[in-house]
Amino acid sequence: SLISFIGAPWTLLVYMLGLKENNGKINFSKTKNKKFNINIILKDLIYYLCIHIENQINAGADVVQIFDTWAGLIPEPELEKFCYNPNLQIVNFCKSKKIPVICFPKGIKEKYLDFQNMVEPNGMNLDYDIDPLWAKENLTKVALQGGMHPKTLLKSKEELYDEANKYL
């Protein structure tokens, strides 16, 4: 299968508006700046991302993966506006085209369950800080992928097998 990739609207906003500070935190006040109408920017991003996805589908993509690299930096009261709703709109677009969707809301930790239930993607990519047993027990509406910390590859063969078996 050919997987297409897109950045989620929030992640694109972080880069477009320079929201990420050197300390790794988000300057959320910029999203409230009157100079930017953040709601219009979000709406436009979703619109153009859907066009981009349609082009990827027409070029042969079988699956879409949405990377929300900076989702974990969204304050909890803003998750619905900046993470759940934009991803839901894109997921619904993909489903209308009969294309499965994998979402990666990186860094939202215990909010993975809320994301699964609100956005309803076909699959979710796990962060390596998500307990695989918790994920298997709770994220039952989606296919799961990923989750193992990249440093695991530097461990002994036995440790690598033990860690991999947690995900099987």
Predicted regions and their residues:
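Active-site loop segments of alpha/beta catalytic cores
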Residues: 1-168
